[in-house]
Each structure stands twice: as structure tokens, then as C-alpha cells.
Amino acid sequence: MDDMYRDYILDHYKNPRNFGELEGATHTYHDSNPLCGDEMTMQLKIGDGHVDDVHFVGKGCAISQASASILTEEVKGKTLDEVKAIDRDHVLANLGIPISPARIKCALLGLKALKGAAWGLTAWPGEEVKAK
């Protein structure tokens, strides 16, 4: 792994951006990865169809937490449609490192929670509502 990208991920893991409860959140979604124990709640404050603010809370590995931190920085000011259009390839490219198949769910947990919040879901189709 390139040192620059490793440092980038470790920085976002150790100093996550937009971490903590978001007062006045209008859209919230909680998700988890039962295979590794990662958990995450993504909270959005939407105004006039745009993301005015975004925070996340949770616990997990460096990849899941860094990925969520990077996403929160990226989506502020975007429209809900722009947020809904973000895909896995975009998230994986933003991490800048190869992600093993065993860690894909870790890397994409933040995206899944972000999109769940953006869509106003309580659970993805075919999944049970996850308790916080």
C-alpha cells in the first residue's frame, strides 16, 4: 500500500471528520456489518434538496471509519440526487488503495448508510431494520 494513501486513511480514522451526533438531523440511517462488528449511523440535515450538514457515529475498523469520514466531507452541499448517484467504484477510488474482497463491506458501509439516509429508508429491501 502506498504510504501516502495509508497515511490518508489513518488520518481519517484517527481524526474522523464530521464524527458525532448531528443536532436537527432530518434523515438518519443505521447499518452494521455483522461479519466484522462494524456499526454506523449516518445523519443528514437536508435543506432545499441539498445536504446542509452530515455527521456519522459508529465504531469499526480503519477502513470503514475512514471511508465514512471521507464521504461526509465530499457530500456537503451536494443535492440528494448527487448523493444517491455515488457508487461503490467512486468510494473505492477515493480510498486510493486496493481493498481485498474480505474488506469490501467495510469500505462500503458508510456509503450504504449514507444512501439509506438519503433515500429515507428504515431498511434496505430484503433486510430487517437494524437496531442501534
Question: Which residues does each predicted region cover?
Answer:
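Immediate flanking context of iron-sulfur cluster ligation sites
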Residues: 50-58
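Short, thiol/selenol-centered motifs that function as redox-active sites or metal-ligating centers
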Residues: 36, 58-66
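Alpha-helical support elements that line or immediately flank enzyme active sites
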Residues: 67-78
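C-terminal binding/interaction regions
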Residues: 1-24, 28-29, 52-53, 78-132
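Short beta-strand elements
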Residues: 33, 38-48
